[in-house]
């Protein structure tokens, strides 16, 4: 069966213009206009998605099948083009019968054209085919528009769902344009309103605990590189070669479709001298569909600039991914559980804003893993927030899992974060020695987020930095009173 893409090529129907009109209409819809005004950070993210929409629409039109009736009419039209005028006169009754049988829009006009002329001349033969072709172009264009309208409705529905999700989560997870873009990419999954409301709930809890939020931000900045510029900078001349498009074309670079009369191909120019094809020539001229030579040129020139010689002293500490281990023992339930989950959500926000990865591991009697910064990050975050903290404490397994992850090339510069009350048994000597080796040889940093003032000092001594957030009633009341 004939595909719509083939039909468009046969009739020189440009679907690109139709696709662009549809996308412009979609972006100008009232729903998107209101959304862009409310969430300006997400506007750029949605705009960056336009090439994907355009490619999906092209594939849809390319794979679409033409209805059998229109296919049969197109085949008949192609066969009629090969007939001479005497042959066309003989075949005309069968052609008219076929058009009526197929309910072609051209059938009635074709009969009127034939009835209005007693003799079928060569000119009438050409006119008949030209008008028939125009009818086929109209039918093909209508079919393109119908398919694009269906796709527009489906695309608008998808975008509205993603806008609802992104709009709810943008205040919680999007701290800048980078985070907004990654959040929009994550919203492509199949999520229901009740699912992502869990993220909203913990986001609101995090806003109620500004000290916890600040703690996460301090931890995220703890590896920020420092640079000290010198003030005695001198100017130096710097030369480079730059390539620029030439003002005068130099050579033929190929063929293109345009309305440039001066660079027409000879076959195109020949059609202008044929009376029967003159109308076709002007139509293609208006639509910029004439085949012309493409001329390009380029030139190189030397560009001289002066720039200061800047010397800086760097204390380089790259900000890598987060590997977060969360204690899910029974002692971490209740308010501790809420704080641990909200803290991980704050780290996810930092990771999205700074284009870092955030990997969560829950440790008790077994290790459960989630990556909150991947393409399925929102779904992974929802699964993590749905977990209940009712297991045991196995810090040794937690550290072994972290060390195994740090040996991977993609995690070599990661920050390891352990969230616990640290009320547990002492670590085995082999684990302690391995952690110290990673700290000494590979400069890995281990952070402890202590949720209790009663954590064992012997366990916590192994960490590079201890971030304390006491969740006891006295500390909670003091924090609330200070606000």
Curated annotation (Swiss-Prot):
Domain of life: Bacteria
Places the protein is found: Cytoplasm
The protein's assembly and partners: Homodimer. Interacts with RavA.
Biological role: Component of the RavA-ViaA chaperone complex, which may act on the membrane to optimize the function of some of the respiratory chains. ViaA stimulates the ATPase activity of RavA.
Gene Ontology CC annotation, any one: cytosol
Official protein name in the record: Regulatory protein ViaA
Annotated SUPFAM superfamilies: vWA-like
Organism of this sequence: Escherichia coli O127:H6 (strain E2348/69 / EPEC)
InterPro entries in UniProt: Uncharacterised_CoxE, Uncharacterised_ViaA, VWF_A, vWFA_dom_sf
Family: Belongs to the ViaA family.
Classification via Pfam families: VWA_CoxE (PF05762)
Disulfide bridge partners, by residue number: none
Keywords, in A-Z order: Chaperone, Cytoplasm
